[in-house]
């Protein structure tokens, strides 16, 4: 039954009682008046006590006030009606009756609250509920709990009412006026609980004040008048009705006072009475007459709190970012709501700081009347000292935790504690008892049978303006008229209290930002063993002063490791406050305790913040009396959990004054920043009741310690006892493990890799695995991951601890899991592995014997020395043979002996220099296995063979650098067929190509060689294929076939071979050199070659380039002709006799070890030229210096170094040695050495330059005849044409023809002499005049580099046109770029200083090549202008490049044209090769597509067949089923014929019905079955 229904039932009962008893004796008017009055009284009481949406939540005080008002009303009515028959006894009875009625209504309301929890939710102002309301009903509750009331009118009063009807009717108007006048006086106590000292006829109406906790609303405000309908029940109006509309009820106080308006009749002399019936009598009356309904009053018994299961101890986890620990709700005015619900037992004593003293009538602010009465009565019996009591301070405006939900707190025995003090201005204190944690959700209002209350503490301190005065008031319903006076006094007290709170609310608004929520607490007495300390009460309170307190810093937030809803664990710091014996004259030590309300749990989580404060003045005087706990260091007093800013941390010492001490210099003695202490009070009486013993809980340790956060139970949880061994407390540091720990780590890694290791790699999570009792069984968990982290971080001091932790992992697993569990078995297997490997860890491995480092070095150096010695011997023989041959060739021609005396000795092979470089002795010059010109085609052929043999090793080493496309099986088959068709003379070359890559095993002499092309790699196959193609194209003459593989790159790659392969190669080369060197003649330059020794080349990095070892000033030996003609640029070259016997063979066959351009001495060509520049296609006039040997390290603007990789073309890489400096004394200054592989014939000619059927037009300068010299290798170079080289000032032309024409040569000499007469130059300053003698030239030694990427040509580079169509045009300006077999090769010859040399080496298949110019722009003023009569000389577009004499440049340009043709041919070959590869790829793709299509068709066919098969099977199955059905139908037909109608089987009947249903038309009539009725036997 809801609250409203209960109230309506009570009203109906009372209406029926009064109305039906008065029907026989009174008229309708009197009954109407009586019922109206009675309903009005009940209505007023109901409106006061109701806690639904029509009553203010603070109705407890209003109800209490209404009781007092009723008494005062009765008192006033009795004083005005002294002539009444009943007198004061009736008045007393009326008061008692009203109190009883109110109590019954309250009981009903409280019962309704239990069933209807939404009462407080529907209230608009739940923040101002006065919790003292629930205690009013306890006084007569026991007496009234078993009494049911039935109201009726007295028979005598009804008779008197009937006799006085006429008189009452006559005087009705007059009495009504008198009643209305008296009504204002009678109803005054109902509308205002006014103070007796200041009575007024029209007192002010108290309105609802939401900021007050005790404000009540008793003003009735309704706009509806009293209903006059007798039979209808009055509806409940709003909260109140105006006093002018209320019916006159109790007293009609007229002048004669002879008649009194009563409930039954207006003329009744007696007051209607209410008889109290026992439940038995009420039941009997209800049974006798249906007019009476017995409604028993049943009180709900208080539910006993169920015993909760034991809480699981849990480890608290500190977390900064968990939800805030307290809830703060504010009103519209910005004030904090005091959300203390009306269901708590704990009375809240509120007081706000008031800056102005209050009058004595306004100082009763601290207690609630009923509670204080109980405390006052119990005070004398409790004067002895008790253990410390926990006291909560709740300042107005903050929420009391865990009260808004209507949950009942844990009941405590009635132990009121009253600390009274004299009436002096006191500090505003808000004191409430600390609430205990409870899971009960019952409201305290439902616990009416318990009259016990929690201890109440009234604290007053004489420091501020308001005083706390306790006024005990005893309410005894059975007492005499003195009770009325006490009730009136209590009314005045409550009014003062309301006014005080109303005034304090205004102050609270101003100081809201400075108020904090604190809680006074005592130390945990369970941990104190000293009885003396227990007896000494420690009252630790915190008083806030709004003018000095800063807002409290946010507390640390915590989160449980597990669920938040299982239990409510209080978080406390390990360091707690310690109770200190406080003598009466000593100041009170203060601590602050912040009470927070968790948003989720709404639990009372209180964090004790110990701030042991000592007054500065008194601490010095009484420092002896303070226990040593007060002088704890700050780091113990201020635990790390507090998240306060540094400036807000209390200094903890008496010597550091705070802001409060600076501002408050008055009589109050302040302490640290967050506390203010009370002064000494000598007459303070402390009455503290001993708190009830709670369930034993582990308290925090007594002495503050700096430890991690623990739960309130002191960290008894096994989660907090997890083994810390092996765990790093600090961050893991970089630790260098000792050998024994390294072995431990290896053993641990072995355990990690074991197949049974996964369960032990990480820590056990009981909640994830569903083993919640794991930590009950396992006290010290451990896992391998933790052990590894600790081991790496240096967490283990000894190996025994490591072993102990490892064994702990296995023992834990075996302890928790039974022996049949797989984890137990896995742990056992891992433990076996550990125990087997751990002894090995303990055993120190024997240290290896110390190696003699010196001995190793000696052995290594000795091996290197042997290899170098062998190579030197072989190269000496090679050089001596080639030099002798060159000298003999020079002696054959008398015309140019002087000019080219040293050309043969100075010309050297680029490939041989790559392979090895000789180290000079004192003169320190280079020779790279110099190869010189041969006198005949046969000698040139043999020499080229020698050069190719020396370069074979480099080709094999560099083969890996070039990535060729994969050779297919078809290509291998085709290559094998082509090799079979080759002549027998070419087979040694094929074998040599294969031998160079060590692809064939060692063969015995004379044995048959079997070549399996399928076993060779692609590199060898590509070389063989290229060799075969060259033979087919006529590029390789049979008489000059090489015995080596095509050379690809420099010799730096040869060093990658091991020593054994080098030795074999060296032996092979020596044999070939000895065989090829026979018959060669010695030349006059043997002295030059014998004057220096060899140096083995050492590969250096790309960036280093080649370094000039030495260039002496005497290394240029000019001929007598050059000396007489002032060393003109024109040096006549005798092709193939003086220096270039092998030039053409080098270009075609890569067999020459010579440089095809023998430099003439150009030092004396120009007067202003000090620099000797040897560039890509030019060299200064060094008649005897090979083009690759004269190197200096003058910086160049673009240092292009790119060596050929596998294509063996000198034009494929350009070198610049400007990065390096000469370490020798005779270094020439400002030499710009740009060495291009195009100038240096390195055994690479065979693979790139094929001068087949090329017509090199050499223009004879005297006769102006174009003599075609065909470098046709297929014709063995038998075409002897004009092979004379004309050397201008800037161009050293190297003729590449094998045969020589003496007549033409002599003509060239004459022309050169004419040029000499025109051009007179002086030797460079760096050259001594004595050096121009016939001394042998000492070429420098060159250290070559590995391949370097080509650099772009700078803007100062001259662009030469190599287009053969421009050989007869004078203006050929555009530079042509051609591509090699694998990449583009840009040929941009750089004309820098004076002479131009051709690039005698063929074009390789290497990457982009450019010929760079030096940084210094060559001078052009000293160069002779071109001859205008020659139309065929090429022109130069670059303004920085010099001009050349037209009569001497034809042969050079023809050479470049031929080279350009070769590049084009190579490009064509490359394109063809790419086309072939593309076709192969397309064919493969087509084959793959065909295969995929074939597979797809096959899959479709398979699917189709499977589908057809399924269809056939389904058809067969269907036919079978149909046949079975047909047979069944036939059988049924036969059975039907055999059986009669009356003997039809059930199956047959069902079949008939089924067939009928199948055949029936859907639109036809429904099936009507006539069923035989079954006779019921019953």
UniProtKB/Swiss-Prot annotation:
Entry superkingdom: Eukaryota
Keyword Oxidoreductase applies: no
Location of the region described as Disordered in the Swiss-Prot/TrEMBL record: 1-39, 108-127, 151-285, 319-454, 543-565, 580-730, 874-969, 1039-1167, 1184-1452, 1480-1544
UniProt xrefs under Gene3D superfamilies: 1.20.1270.220, Bromodomain-like (1.20.920.10)
Record domain NET: where: 957-1039
Biased composition annotated in UniProt, kind: Basic and acidic residues: 152-163, 1064-1077, 1480-1538
Endpoints of the signal sequence: none
Keywords for the protein's UniProt record, in alphabetical order: Bromodomain, Coiled coil
Biased composition, class Basic residues, residue ranges: 1092-1107
GO function terms (MF aspect): lysine-acetylated histone binding
Biased composition (Low complexity): 18-35, 164-185, 197-231, 352-383, 396-407, 417-433, 604-653, 660-686, 881-911, 918-961, 1047-1061, 1112-1167, 1205-1218, 1231-1334, 1370-1386, 1400-1424, 1432-1451
Polar residues bias spans: 319-332, 340-351, 384-395, 443-454, 1356-1369, 1387-1399
Record's GO cellular component terms: chromatin; nucleus
Coiled-coil regions listed in the entry: 479-506, 851-903, 1113-1150, 1280-1308, 1462-1544
Pfam families: BET (PF17035), Bromodomain (PF00439)
GO biological process assignments: chromatin remodeling; regulation of DNA-templated transcription
Bromo domain segment(s): 735-841
Biased composition (Acidic residues): 1-12, 1192-1204
SUPFAM superfamilies: Bromodomain (SSF47370)
InterPro entries assigned: Bromo_chromatin_reader (IPR050935), Bromodomain (IPR001487), Bromodomain-like_sf (IPR036427), Bromodomain_CS (IPR018359), NET_dom (IPR027353), NET_sf (IPR038336)
Name the record gives this protein: Bromodomain-containing protein DDB_G0270170
């Amino acid at each position: 039954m809801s609250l409203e229904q209960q109230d309506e039932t009570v009203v109906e009962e009372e209406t029926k009682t009064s109305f039906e008893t008065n029907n026989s004796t009174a008229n309708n008017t009197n009954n109407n008046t009586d019922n109206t009055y009675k309903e009005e009284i009940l209505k007023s009481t109901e409106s006061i006590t109701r806690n639904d949406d029509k009553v203010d939540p603070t109705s407890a005080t209003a109800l209490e006030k209404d009781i007092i008002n009723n008494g005062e009303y009765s008192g006033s009515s009795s004083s005005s009606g002294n002539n009444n028959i009943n007198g004061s006894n009736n008045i007393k009875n009326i008061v008692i009756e009203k109190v009883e009625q109110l109590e019954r209504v309250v009981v009903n309301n409280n019962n309704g609250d239990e069933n209807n929890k939404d009462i407080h939710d529907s209230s608009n102002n739940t923040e101002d509920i006065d919790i003292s309301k629930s205690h009013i009903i306890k006084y007569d509750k026991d007496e009234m709990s078993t009494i049911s009331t039935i109201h009726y009118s007295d028979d005598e009063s009804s008779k008197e009412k009937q006799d006085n009807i006429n008189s009452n009717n006559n005087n009705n108007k007059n009495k009504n006026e008198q009643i209305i006048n008296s009504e204002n006086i009678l109803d005054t106590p109902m509308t205002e609980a006014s103070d007796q000292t200041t009575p007024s006829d029209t007192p002010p109406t108290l309105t609802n004040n939401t900021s007050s906790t005790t404000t009540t609303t008793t003003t009735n405000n309704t706009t509806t008048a009293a209903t006059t309908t007798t039979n209808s029940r009055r509806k409940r109006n709003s909260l109140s009705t105006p006093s002018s509309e209320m019916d006159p009820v109790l007293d009609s106080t007229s002048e004669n006072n002879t008649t009194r308006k009563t409930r039954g009749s207006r003329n009744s002399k007696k007051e209607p009475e209410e008889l109290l019936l026992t439940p038995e009598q009420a039941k009997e009356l209800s049974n006798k007459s249906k007019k009476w309904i017995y409604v028993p009053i049943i009180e709900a018994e208080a539910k006993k709190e169920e015993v909760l299961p034991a809480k699981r101890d849990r480890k608290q986890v500190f977390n900064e970012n968990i939800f805030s620990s307290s809830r703060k709700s504010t009103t519209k005015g910005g004030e904090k709501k005091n959300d203390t619900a009306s269901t708590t037992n704990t009375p809240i004593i509120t007081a706000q700081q008031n800056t102005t003293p209050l009058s004595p009538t306004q100082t009763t602010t601290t207690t609630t009347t009923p509670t204080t009465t109980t405390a006052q009565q119990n005070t004398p019996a409790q004067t002895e000292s008790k253990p410390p009591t926990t006291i909560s301070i709740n300042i107005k405006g903050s929420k009391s935790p865990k009260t808004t939900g209507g949950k009942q707190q844990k009941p405590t025995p009635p132990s009121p504690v009253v600390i009274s003090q004299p009436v002096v201005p006191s500090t505003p204190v808000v004191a409430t008892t600390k609430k205990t944690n409870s899971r009960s959700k019952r409201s305290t209002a439902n616990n009416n049978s318990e009259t016990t209350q929690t201890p109440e503490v009234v604290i007053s301190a004489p420091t501020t303006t308001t005083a706390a005065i306790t006024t005990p008031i005893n309410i005894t319903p059975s007492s005499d008229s003195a009770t009325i006076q006490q009730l009136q006094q209590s009314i005045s007290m409550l009014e003062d209290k309301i006014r005080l709170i109303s005034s304090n609310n205004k102050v609270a608004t101003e100081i809201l930002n400075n108020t904090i929520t604190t809680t006074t607490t005592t130390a945990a007495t369970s941990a104190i063993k000293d009885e003396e300390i227990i007896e000494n009460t420690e009252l630790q309170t915190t008083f806030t002063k709004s003018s000095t307190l800063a807002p409290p810093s946010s507390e640390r937030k915590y989160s449980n490791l597990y669920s938040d809803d299982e239990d409510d664990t209080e978080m406390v710091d390990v360091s707690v406050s310690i109770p200190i014996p406080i003598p009466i004259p000593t100041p009170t030590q203060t601590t602050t305790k912040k009470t927070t309300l968790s948003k989720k749990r709404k639990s009372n989580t209180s964090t004790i913040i110990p701030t042991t404060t000592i007054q500065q003045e008194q601490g010095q005087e009484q420092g002896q009396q303070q226990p040593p706990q007060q002088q704890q260091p700050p780091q113990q007093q201020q635990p790390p959990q507090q998240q306060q800013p540094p400036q807000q941390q209390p200094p903890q010492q008496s010597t550091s004054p705070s802001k409060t001490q600076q501002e408050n210099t008055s009589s109050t003695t302040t302490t640290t920043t967050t506390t203010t202490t009370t002064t000494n009070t000598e007459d303070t009486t402390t009455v503290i009741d001993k708190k009830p013993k709670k369930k034993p809980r582990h308290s925090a340790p007594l002495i503050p310690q700096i430890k991690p956060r623990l739960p309130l139970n002191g960290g008894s949880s096994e989660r907090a006892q997890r083994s810390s061994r092996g765990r790093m407390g600090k961050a893991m540091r970089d630790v260098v493990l000792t050998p024994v720990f390294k072995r431990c780590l290896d053993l641990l890694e072995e355990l990690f890799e074991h197949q049974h290791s996964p369960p032990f790699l990480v820590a056990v999570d009981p909640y994830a695995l569903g083993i919640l009792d794991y930590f009950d069984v396992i006290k010290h968990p451990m896992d391998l991951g933790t052990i590894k982290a600790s081991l790496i971080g240096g967490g283990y001091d000894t190996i025994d601890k490591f072993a102990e932790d490892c064994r702990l992992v296995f023992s834990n697993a075996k302890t928790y899991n039974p022996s049949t569990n797989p984890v137990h078995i896995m742990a056992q297997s891992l433990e076996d592995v550990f125990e087997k490997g751990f002894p090995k860890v303990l055993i120190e491995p024997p240290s290896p014997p110390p190696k003699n480092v010196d001995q190793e070095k000696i052995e290594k150096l000795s091996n290197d020395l042997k290899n170098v010695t062998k190579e030197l011997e072989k190269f000496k023989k090679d050089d001596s043979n080639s030099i002798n041959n060159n000298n003999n060739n020079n002696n054959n021609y008398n015309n140019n002996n002087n000019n080219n005396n040293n050309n043969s000795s100075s010309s050297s092979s680029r490939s041989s220099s790559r392979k090895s470089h000789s180290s000079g002795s004192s003169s320190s010059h280079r020779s790279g296995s110099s190869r010189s010109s041969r006198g005949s085609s046969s000698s040139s052929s043999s020499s080229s063979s020698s050069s190719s043999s020396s370069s074979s090793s480099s080709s094999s080493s560099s083969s890996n650098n070039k990535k060729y496309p994969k050779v297919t099986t078809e290509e291998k088959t085709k290559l094998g067929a082509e090799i079979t068709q080759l002549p027998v003379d070419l087979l040694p070359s094929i074998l040599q190509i294969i031998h160079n890559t060590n692809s064939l095993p060692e063969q015995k002499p004379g044995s048959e060689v079997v070549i399996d092309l399928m076993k060779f790699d692609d590199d060898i196959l590509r070389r063989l294929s290229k060799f075969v193609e060259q033979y087919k194209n006529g590029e390789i003459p049979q008489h000059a076939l090489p015995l080596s593989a095509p050379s690809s790159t420099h010799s730096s790659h040869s060093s990658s071979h091991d020593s054994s392969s080098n030795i074999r190669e060296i032996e092979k080369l020596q044999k070939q050199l000895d065989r090829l060197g026979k018959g060669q003649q010695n030349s006059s330059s043997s002295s030059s070659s014998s004057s220096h020794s060899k140096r083995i080349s050492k590969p250096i990095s790309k960036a280093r380039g080649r370094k000039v070892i030495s260039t002496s000033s005497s290394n240029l030996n000019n001929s007598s002709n050059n000396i007489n003609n002032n060393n003109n640029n024109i040096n006549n070259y005798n092709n193939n006799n003086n220096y270039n016997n092998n030039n053409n063979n080098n270009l075609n066959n890569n067999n020459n070890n010579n440089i095809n351009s023998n430099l003439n001495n150009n030092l004396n060509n120009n007067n202003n030229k000090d620099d000797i520049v040897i560039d890509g296609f030019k060299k200064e006039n060094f008649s005897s210096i090979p083009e690759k040997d004269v190197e200096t390290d003058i910086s160049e603007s673009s240092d292009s170094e790119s060596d050929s990789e596998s294509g063996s073309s000198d034009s494929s890489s350009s070198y610049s040695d400007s990065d390096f400096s000469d370490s020798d004394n005779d270094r020439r200054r400002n030499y710009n050495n740009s060495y291009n592989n195009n100038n240096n014939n390195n055994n690479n000619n065979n693979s790139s330059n094929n001068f087949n059927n090329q017509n090199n037009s050499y223009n004879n300068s005297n006769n102006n005849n174009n003599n075609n010299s065909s470098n046709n290798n297929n014709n063995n170079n038998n075409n002897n044409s004009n092979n004379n080289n004309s050397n201008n000032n800037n161009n050293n032309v190297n003729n590449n023809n094998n045969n020589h024409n003496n007549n033409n040569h002599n003509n060239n000499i004459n022309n050169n002499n004419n040029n000499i007469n025109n051009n007179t130059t002086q030797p460079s300053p760096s050259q001594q005049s004595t050096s121009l003698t016939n001394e042998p030239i000492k070429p420098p030694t060159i250290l070559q580099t590995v391949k370097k990427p080509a650099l772009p040509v700078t803007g100062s580079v001259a662009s030469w046109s190599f287009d053969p169509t421009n050989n007869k045009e004078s203006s050929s300006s555009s530079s042509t770029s051609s591509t090699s077999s694998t990449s583009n090769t840009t040929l941009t010859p750089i004309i820098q200083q004076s002479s131009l040399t051709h690039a005698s080496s063929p074009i390789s298949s290497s990457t982009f090549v450019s010929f760079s110019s030096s940084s210094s722009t060559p001078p052009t003023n000293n160069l002779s202008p071109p001859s205008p009569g020659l139309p065929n000389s090429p022109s130069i577009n670059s303004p920085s490049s010099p001009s050349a004499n037209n009569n001497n440049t034809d042969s050079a340009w023809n050479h470049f044209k031929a080279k350009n043709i070769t590049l084009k041919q190579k490009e064509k070959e490359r394109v063809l090769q790419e086309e072939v590869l593309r076709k192969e790829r397309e064919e493969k793709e087509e084959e793959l597509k065909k295969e995929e299509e074939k597979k797809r068709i096959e899959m479709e066919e398979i699917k189709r067949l499977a589908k057809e098969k399924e269809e056939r099977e389904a058809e067969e199955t269907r036919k079978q089923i149909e046949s079975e059905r047909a047979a069944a139908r036939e059988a049924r037909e036969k059975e039907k014929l055999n059986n009669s109608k009356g003997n039809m089987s059930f199956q047959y009947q069902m079949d008939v019905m089924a067939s009928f249903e199948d055949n029936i038309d859907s639109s036809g009539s429904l099936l009507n079955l006539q069923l035989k009725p079954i006779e019921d036997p019953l």
